[in-house]
Structure formats: structure tokens, C-alpha cells
Amino acid sequence: MKKIKFVANWTGKEEFLIADNLTDNEIKVMIASRNNEYNDIMDGGTWSFTVCDNSGLSPKVYRGVVSSLIKKGYAFVSGKRGDEMFALTDEGKNLFKKE
């Protein structure tokens, strides 16, 4: 099992992302969804632009990564382009573990 360790901004605690089925860029987006200035993705959606900014990816690459996460059933996006929200499905949230 591939586990990526990180500290979640909103909890301040060490957590793990189960990354067996994730690319390096998908890992960046998933962790950025936990570590952004607006909302912990575990509590609901957050602005897509802040996930993109915190991932370090270009907007074009970010959109492709999000499409891949959607196809895998881990994420979804709502709203119109430029004002969209990024959120995780229950399956996506289950990739995050505290231990």
C-alpha cells in the first residue's frame, strides 16, 4: 500500500493519503484539496481555483488531473467555469486516513 504522509492544515495533524491508484499530479491535487485557505475538503467543497493554486500545477494540467479524478470516482466539480467548486466523493474522502 502506497501511503503519502502530510500534515492537514485544518486539523494540524499528521494524516495519510492512500495513493495506490493515483498519479503524482493526482496526489498533488488531493493534498491541495486538504491544504487550502478556504475549506477542508472533508467538510464539503472548496473553490477549484484554490486547489489549483495550492497544487502547484498549471490550470491546464490541473483541469486534466481533475477530469481523471472524476473518472476514477474520487471527485466532482459543480458550478460554471471560473466559479466552480471542487469536492470529493465518499470514495475520494476514504483515501485519507489518520493512521
Can you describe what each PLM-predicted range is?
Residues 1-20:
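Long, low-complexity, charged/polar intrinsically disordered regions in eukaryotic proteins
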Residues 70-80:
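A short, conserved structural fragment
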Residues 56-71:
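Short amphipathic alpha-helical interaction segments
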Residues 35-36:
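Short helix-capping/turn signature of helix-turn-helix
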Residues 39-54:
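Short acidic, hydrophobic short linear motifs in intrinsically disordered regions
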Residues 80-99:
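Short, cationic-aromatic polyanion-contact patches
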Residues 20-32:
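Short helix-coil-helix linker/hinge
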